[in-house]
Amino acid sequence: MPKFAREQAIRTPNSPAMTDPSKSLTWEQVDEIINRAANLILATDLGEKRRIAVFAENSSETALAHLGGLFGGASSVPVNFHLTAEEASYILKDSESYILFVDDKTAERGIQASREAGITSVIGWDCQEYTEVTNWDDWLLTGSPDLCPDEVVPRPNLLYTSGTTGLPKGTELPPTMFAG
């Protein structure tokens, strides 16, 4: 997608690429955000499994955090935004995630879950009142907008079952399921 986003950004830079109830992003903006996020994630030591987790309601930022992870060579772990801090902590520990992305509605639970799981990097949007959370926009500004490398191999995403017969279980899904 970064190549696709870059091509669209060149052809139609000001055309809408992504819209949610609070904003609309152009192809040029999406291209820059994905590349900045991917380059930052690519440069971060995420351990052997290279996992990030996204604990947020549906939004442009939620999708872009997942895409940044995918193109940054990480396995993305969606965490259901309805979960309690304890339930989210279980998934964060079990998945061995290193970065947690949150929004204003999950930040408090995400901070608690990240502490319990040993995650020290929590990045969020609309979370200005939480000093433990790195601001998404500020974080992105520290990353390079250059096209992320093509040779980065996407890793399988890790989705968790509902846990109807016990604790949720992680199931790896191929990255091409979402973008391929």
Please annotate each region the language model reported.
Residues 74, 117-121:
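A short helix->loop->beta-strand "cap" motif at the edges of active sites that frequently abuts
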Residues 14, 143-162, 166-167:
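Conserved pre-ATP/AMP-binding loop-to-beta segment of ANL
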Residues 23, 38-86:
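Conserved AMP-binding/adenylate-forming
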Residues 3-26, 43, 131:
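AMP-dependent adenylate-forming
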Residues 26-28, 156-180:
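Conserved AMP-binding A3 loop
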Residues 56, 79-80, 120-129:
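Short beta-strand elements of ligand-binding domains
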Residues 83-113:
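Conserved ATP-dependent adenylate/AMP-binding module captured primarily in the ANL superfamily
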